């Protein structure tokens, strides 16, 4: 009886895993169709803190600029 329960549980896990892979493949395909032409090119974002920012900044942080690209940010 224990063997039957284990085999049933394993079969259920395999079936759920196959379903999850199919759903992930469909989600990846849909995402690729929604964004044509976007390869793995990094996107760059730039943030600049104005002198009159809402949060008080120390003298060393005034005019601080952050450049963020895919994977890391660096401060200028």
UniProtKB/Swiss-Prot annotation:
RTD-1 and RTD-3 have similar antimicrobial activities against the Gram-positive bacteria S.aureus 502A and L.monocytogenes, the Gram-negative bacteria S.typhimurium and E.coli ML35, and the fungi C.albicans 16820 and C.neoformans 271A. Residues 23-64, 74-76 form a propeptide. Residues 1-22 form the signal peptide. There is a cross-link at residue 73 (Cyclopeptide (Cys-Arg) (interchain with R-65 in subunit A)). RTD-1 is 10-fold more present in cells than RTD-3. Residues 25-45 are annotated as: Disordered. There is a cross-link at residue 65 (Cyclopeptide (Arg-Cys) (interchain with C-73 in subunit A)). Forms a cyclic peptide with subunit A (RTD-3) or with subunit B (RTD-1). An additional intersubunit disulfide bond is formed. It comes from the Eukaryota. The keyword Lipid biosynthesis does not apply. InterPro entries: Alpha-defensin, Alpha-defensin_N. RTD-1 is a cyclic heterodimer composed of subunits A and B; disulfide-linked. RTD-3 is a cyclic homodimer composed of two subunits A; disulfide-linked. RTD-1 is expressed in bone marrow. Detected in promyelocytes, myelocytes and mature neutrophils and monocytes. GO terms for biological process: antibacterial humoral response; antimicrobial humoral immune response mediated by antimicrobial peptide; cellular response to lipopolysaccharide; defense response to fungus; defense response to Gram-negative bacterium; defense response to Gram-positive bacterium; disruption of plasma membrane integrity in another organism; innate immune response in mucosa. The gene is RTD1A. Pfam families: Defensin_propep (PF00879). It comes from Macaca mulatta (Rhesus macaque). Belongs to the alpha-defensin family. Theta subfamily. There is a cross-link at residue 73 (Cyclopeptide (Cys-Arg) (interchain with R-65 in subunit B)). GO terms for cellular component: extracellular space. There is a cross-link at residue 65 (Cyclopeptide (Arg-Cys) (interchain with C-73 in subunit B)). Disulfide bonds join 68-73. Keywords: Antibiotic, Antimicrobial, Defensin, Disulfide bond, Fungicide, Signal. This is Rhesus theta defensin-1/3 subunit A.
């Amino acid at each position: 009886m224990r063997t039957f329960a284990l085999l049933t549980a394993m079969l259920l896990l395999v079936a759920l895993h196959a379903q999850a892979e199919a759903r992930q493949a469909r989600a990846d395909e849909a995402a690729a169709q929604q964004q044509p032409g976007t390869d793995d090119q990094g996107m760059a974002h730039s943030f600049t803190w104005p002198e009159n920012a809402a949060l008080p900044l120390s003298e060393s942080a005034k005019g601080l600029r952050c450049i963020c690209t895919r994977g890391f940010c660096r401060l200028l």
